[in-house]
Amino acid sequence: YVWDRNYSETRLPEVPSAILEMLSHQSFPDMRIAQDPLGKFYIARSIYKTILRFVNSNHGTRYVVQPLAPQNFSVTQNGGVALLSWSAQLDKTEPSARPTSYIIYKAEGQGGFDNGTIVNTTRCQMQLEPGKLYHFKVAAVNAGGESFTTETLSVLYNPAASKSVLIVNNFHRLASPQVVDDEEKQGFDFDQDPGVSYGLTAGWSGKQQVFDRSRMGNETSFGLGFSGNEMIGKFVAGNDFNYVQAHATSIAASGKYNISSCSSEVIASGRVQMQNYQAVDLINGLERHDGYTHAFFKSFTPELQNRIRQYASQGGRILISGSYNGSDMQTEEEQAFLSDILKLSYEPTGSTVIARDINPEDSTVTERDSIVCTSPNVKGLGLQFSYYNELNAQHYAATHPEILKPVGNYAFTAMQYDTGTSAAVAYKSTTYRSFVMGFPLECIIDESTRTSVLLGILKFLTD
């Protein structure tokens, strides 16, 4: 441990240094900021700006602040030519952070990213080699440095393909563990929602065990905020912003489709039209409106709902996977979207339903209460498989998969948890088709199984 060590860097004058008292661990509002990945970023960027201004002002030189990551990223292809498009994200508090150029990083197939190509505009065309899968990400640049990169997007030109798939990334969420803050309880509830870190993170000693506000100030194992130590030294995978790449790799294995991809932002704005594609693969991941994160995240924003409605009315074929496709849609209008367009209803885990047991000898029926639940094991499409459902260092976990039930004619359960509850709902009519999963497809542990599942769903949607 280093928390109780004698920090010579802050005592000896050889190296200029300082301890910044930004937040108090005894202030819950402060800790909400400290646990929020976006809060950590804002604090770090503020410190960076302060040091930059201090050093440059001492030397009488002009400073330029590093830009923010580009947004509204899309990579679409037409006839073997890829069009990359994005927009600058401006820092409203710092005029000098405006980007002057961009770096496009490219990877081919299973290879790593190159050292990047500098461009001066927010659009770029590239010739694609037939049959080769490409992955791209973009960073903004100015005299102050280079930004974080965008999410990773993928593109594939297959001359023999008659159908094109658009992969849409809607998993942008970053969040602390579930905030509990009422008259009786206070803290972070890992079991309710472990949150979403930015990439791989080792940030916790253990789960909070005591939430009783009446025990505030008690410095014992019974005091408010007391936590375990089971997570000391353990890394937890978060949002890597590269799940389009995983989906594209599976789709490319079929050799049957062209692939384009984009962020959900450009779908909502209409810059990329879903109706130009024979199928859409929407990645929702752990996206949801949690009610405590400062930034707004949502599985289906009103704008995205409208685009999906339009796509369905024009004969669209859409796959949607994620952990909160049902629970994140609670208003009357949102539930109408689920039932009218996606042909499903959400059943909370732990709900009590009436089960009917039939006696095979005399056919008598006995009714009993049964509690519905999910499991990490799923069967469907002729396969049995497992997905990441516990925190680990390899891949983000779907700790709260959902039960999605079919609604109306032509909708049916396409996957089941081994508890017998519905894990996915498929809908096939003469107008449009949909396939909605109660857990993220990219969380399927075995890669070959994940590919088989995704290609099986695309076959259902497009054949």
What are these regions (language model features)?
Residues Y1-H59, G438-L441:
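Active-site-adjacent mobile loop/cap segments within catalytic or ligand-binding domains
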Residues T152-Q278, I283-L286, L455-D463:
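Aromatic-Pro/Gly-enriched surface loop or interdomain linker
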Residues T352-D446:
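Catalytic beta-strand/loop cores that center a nucleophilic Ser/Cys/Thr
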Residues T100-I104:
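Short beta-strand elements bearing conserved aromatic residues within extracellular beta-rich modules
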Residues L286-A393, V453:
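A glycine-rich, often tryptophan-bearing local segment used as a flexible ligand/cofactor-contacting loop or short
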Residues Q125-E146:
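Beta-strand-rich modules
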Residues R53-S96, P130, G145-S162:
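Pro/Thr/Ser/Gly-rich low-complexity, intrinsically disordered linker/stalk tracts
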